[in-house]
C-alpha cells in the first residue's frame, strides 16, 4: 500500500467496545497498540486522524475489579467516570510510543444541539488537528443521562466527522461489515461490499445486534453511515480485528462495506439539523404535504399536518412522518406542540385568529428542513 497516494486528508475512526476488549472483559492493550500504530502511520503520512473511542465503562469495570453493580444509569455513570481516565491514559501512552500527543473531547447531546456550542466544539476539534494532536472523542457518560443508550458512539462519530469536515468515517466492529443476512445464524450470509443508497430494506438487514459490553449494533452503524454520507463523507464498516484494517480502508482496498457519499451533500446548517439535534417529536403529514416537502422542496404548512406526536417547544427538531410511520424529513418547528394541536389541518391565514399570534405561515420552513 502506498500512503503517499491517499486521497483522504481527514479521517474519523470509531472503535467499539468489542474491538477494544477483543471479546474479553478488559481492554486488549496489545490490540490497541496495533490500532494506534496504524493511525500514527496515517498522521505521519499527512492524514489527520480523529479517534472516537468507546470502552470507558468496560475500563471502569476492569479498574475497579469487576464489582457486582446493579444495571442502573447511576452505576453506568460511576463506571464511566472511573473508566474514562483509564481509557485516555491508555491511548496517551500508546500514541506516545509513536511521538504523538492526544487531546480529549467529552461531548453530550446538548453540545451538539445548541448551535453556538456546536461551533465551539468544531473550533476545539480543528485546533487540535491543526497542531498535530489526535483528538480523542467520547460521550460524556459521567454526566449524561439519556445519552447512555444504544448507538451513542456510532452516531457521535458521524457527528464528529461532520464537525471536522472529514473525508472518511471508519466504523470498526466485531463483524466484517454489513451482510445480506445475520452471519451468526446463517453461514451462507454474504458480505455487502458496496452501498449506494440506504433504504428500508437495508435497515431491516442491519437488524439490532448488540455486543455484550458495548452499546452499539449494526443498525446504529447504518444510522451513522447515513448521516455521514449525506454530508459528503464516505463510510467504511469493517472488522476491527482484520490486519491493517485502518490502512486498508484509507487506501481504498477491498475491506468491509463501503458507503458512497452523496454527490450533492447538505450545506452546513442542514448538516447540523440532521446530526446535531435529536428529534423530540413527530408530525404526521398527509399525502399532499409529503409530496410538497419531498418532491417540490416546499415548506410544511399547517394544512398538511394530520396529527402531532409528543410534547415540545418551538425551535425543536421534529421528525416528519407519513401515516405508516416512515420518516420523510426532519426539521425545526416554528410552533410548540400545544400550538400545533390547535392549528392542525387549518389554513395558514387562520393561525393568528386561532392562536392570537403567528410565527409565519410555515410550520417548518424549507430552510430549516432536511428531506430524507
UniProtKB/Swiss-Prot annotation:
Might you report a single GO cellular component term?
Answer: cytosol
Primary role: Catalyzes the transfer of a phosphate group to glutamate to form L-glutamate 5-phosphate.
Q: Which family does it belong to?
A: Belongs to the glutamate 5-kinase family.
User: What metabolic or biological pathway is this protein involved in?
Assistant: Amino-acid biosynthesis; L-proline biosynthesis; L-glutamate 5-semialdehyde from L-glutamate: step 1/2
Which PROSITE patterns does the annotation name? GLUTAMATE_5_KINASE, PUA
Start and end of every PUA domain?
Answer: 280-358
Gene3D superfamilies recorded for this chain? Acetylglutamate kinase-like, PUA domain
Q: Name one GO molecular function term.
A: glutamate 5-kinase activity
- The superkingdom listed in its UniProt entry is Bacteria
- The positions annotated for binding ATP are 14, 173-174, 215-221
EC nos: 2.7.2.11
Q: Where in the cell is it found?
A: Cytoplasm
Recorded name of the encoding gene: proB
GO biological process entries? L-proline biosynthetic process
Q: Which UniProt keywords apply?
A: Amino-acid biosynthesis, ATP-binding, Cytoplasm, Kinase, Nucleotide-binding, Proline biosynthesis, Transferase
Record keyword DNA-binding present: no
Q: What is this protein called?
A: Glutamate 5-kinase
Amino acid at each position: 500500500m502506498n500512503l503517499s497516494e491517499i486521497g483522504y486528508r481527514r479521517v474519523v475512526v470509531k472503535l467499539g467496545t468489542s474491538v477494544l476488549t477483543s471479546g474479553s472483559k478488559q481492554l486488549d492493550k496489545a490490540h490497541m497498540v496495533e490500532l494506534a500504530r496504524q493511525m500514527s502511520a496515517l498522521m505521519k503520512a499527512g492524514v489527520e486522524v480523529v479517534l472516537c473511542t468507546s470502552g470507558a465503562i468496560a475500563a471502569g469495570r476492569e479498574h475497579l475489579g469487576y464489582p457486582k453493580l446493579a444495571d442502573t444509569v447511576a452505576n453506568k455513570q460511576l463506571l464511566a467516570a472511573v473508566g474514562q481516565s483509564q481509557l485516555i491514559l491508555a491511548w496517551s501512552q500508546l500514541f506516545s510510543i509513536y511521538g504523538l500527543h492526544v487531546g480529549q473531547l467529552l461531548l453530550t447531546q446538548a453540545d451538539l444541539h445548541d448551535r453556538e456550542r456546536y461551533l465551539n466544539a468544531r473550533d476545539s476539534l480543528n485546533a487540535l488537528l491543526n497542531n498535530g494532536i489526535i483528538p480523542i472523542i467520547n460521550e460524556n457518560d459521567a454526566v449524561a443521562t439519556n445519552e447512555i443508550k444504544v448507538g451513542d458512539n456510532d452516531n457521535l462519530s458521524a457527528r464528529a466527522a461532520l464537525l471536522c469536515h472529514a473525508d472518511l468515517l471508519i466504523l470498526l466492529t466485531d463483524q466484517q461489515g454489513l451482510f445480506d443476512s445475520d452471519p451468526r445464524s446463517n453461514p451462507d450470509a454474504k458480505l455487502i461490499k458496496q452501498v449506494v443508497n440506504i433504504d428500508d430494506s437495508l435497515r431491516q438487514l442491519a437488524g439490532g445486534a448488540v455486543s455484550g459490553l458495548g452499546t452499539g449494533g449494526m443498525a446504529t452503524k447504518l444510522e451513522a453511515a447515513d448521516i455521514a454520507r449525506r454530508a459528503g463523507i464516505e463510510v467504511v464498516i469493517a472488522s476491527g480485528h482484520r490486519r491493517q484494517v485502518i490502512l486498508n480502508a484509507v487506501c481504498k482496498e477491498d475491506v468491509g462495506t463501503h458507503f458512497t457519499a452523496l454527490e450533492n451533500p447538505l450545506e452546513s446548517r442542514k448538516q447540523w439539523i440532521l446530526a446535531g439535534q435529536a428529534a423530540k417529536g413527530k408530525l404526521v403529514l398527509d399525502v399532499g404535504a409529503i409530496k410538497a416537502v419531498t418532491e417540490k422542496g416546499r415548506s410544511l404548512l399547517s394544512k398538511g399536518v394530520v396529527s402531532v406526536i409528543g410534547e415540545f417547544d418551538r425551535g425543536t427538531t421534529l421528525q416528519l412522518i407519513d401515516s405508516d410511520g416512515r420518516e420523510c424529513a426532519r426539521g425545526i418547528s416554528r410552533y410548540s406542540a400545544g400550538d400545533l394541536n390547535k392549528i392542525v389541518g387549518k389554513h395558514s391565514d387562520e393561525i393568528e385568529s386561532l392562536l392570537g399570534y403567528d410565527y409565519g405561515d410555515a410550520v417548518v420552513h424549507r430552510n430549516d428542513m432536511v428531506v430524507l
